[in-house]
Amino acid sequence: MSDRLTLLRPDDWHIHLRDGAALANTVGDAARTFGRAIVMPNLVPPVRNAAEADAYRQRILAARPAASRFEPLMVLYLTDRTSAEEIRTAKASGFVHAAKLYPAGATTNSDSGVTRIDNIFEALEAMAEVGMPLLVHGEVTRAEVDVFDREKQFIDEHLRRVVERFPTLKVVFEHITTGDAAQFVREAPANVGATITAHHLLYNRNHMLVGGIRPHFYCLPILKRNTHQEALLDAAVSGNPKFFLGTDSAPHARHAKETACGCAGCYSAYAAIELYAEAFEQRNALDKLEGFASLHGPDFYGLPRNTDRITLVREEWQAPASLPFGDFDVVPLRAGETLRWKLLEAGA
């Protein structure tokens, strides 16, 4: 078993960098590993058009570490009022690479999201025409639907219909959490792909709920039972190009997580590729990591692969108990615990 693993530099096809003072921390953590990242638009207010995307992009670029070539790939936040013209303008910008469907109320800062899928059909038609992928948070939000069933319900009620109605539209089913979602993506046409997070590969709902509630495992879509975790691992290590890396790294200040009504999100960007390496090693599939992390994503988006490389070494190190997050701190995934792989920094 090798103690070194060299990969083409990976990209993160789903990340939350937040805004303001937090960018000084989140951008550096992402840029340490990734060449590019699809940046989620659920700010307050959300990123709804090309002008707002450009302003956010400039704030991210200003926060890059010195000499970093990290490239933020911007995303529009779809609303009931997103027009075809806004889609075309965004595509023409060259820096907006996708548009995101948040069902209203599904997750953090999604209150401005889509209330009925039919309301965005005009925008989806334009996206199919110009070649802009649709990114989907795939959960229904009706109160009577159990939180553990909301992803499957979304597939049955909405996603099948969207894929059938817009056969040329690229669709990324983001942060899939169930065997149902993995099966749907496998069986769907080639224009449908999915991202999988490190935390959904490494953990299941027992980790969050057994022996006490652990708020830093709480995320949306929520961790599912271990059979779904195993199905996600099967998909990730399969070599199927429909599945690729998307951390959904989503930081919240400690006080917003460790509270009676805590926010959803796990912060993994600080050690993302190391965490994925652990998951793939569990399946004796480190040889499949480069495809999942570095090849499948750019191929799906029609972007060039990165040409530089990173190296991981088998070396134990302790994850920090907390990290700076703007004016506060964030408790990262695996805080205070031992990680088994370490990114070899440039020049080391």
Swiss-Prot record:
Co-factor(s): Zn(2+)
Annotated pathway: Pyrimidine metabolism; UMP biosynthesis via de novo pathway; (S)-dihydroorotate from bicarbonate: step 3/3
Which N-terminal residues, if any, form the signal peptide? none
The GO cellular component terms are: cytosol
Q: How is the cofactor bound?
A: Binds 2 Zn(2+) ions per subunit.
Pfam families, per database record = Amidohydro_1 (PF01979)
Work out whether the entry's keyword set contains Hydrolase. yes
Q: Where are the transmembrane segments?
A: none
Question: Would I find Zinc among this entry's keywords?
Answer: yes
What Gene Ontology terms describe what this protein does at the molecular function level? dihydroorotase activity; zinc ion binding
Q: Which residues form the active site?
A: 248
Modification type N6-carboxylysine: residues? 100
One GO biological-process annotation of the entry reads: 'de novo' UMP biosynthetic process
Family per UniProt?
Answer: Belongs to the metallo-dependent hydrolases superfamily. DHOase family. Class II DHOase subfamily.
Query: Its biological function?
Result: Catalyzes the reversible cyclization of carbamoyl aspartate to dihydroorotate.
| Subunit text | Homodimer.
* Name of the protein described by the UniProt record: Dihydroorotase
This protein's gene is called: pyrC
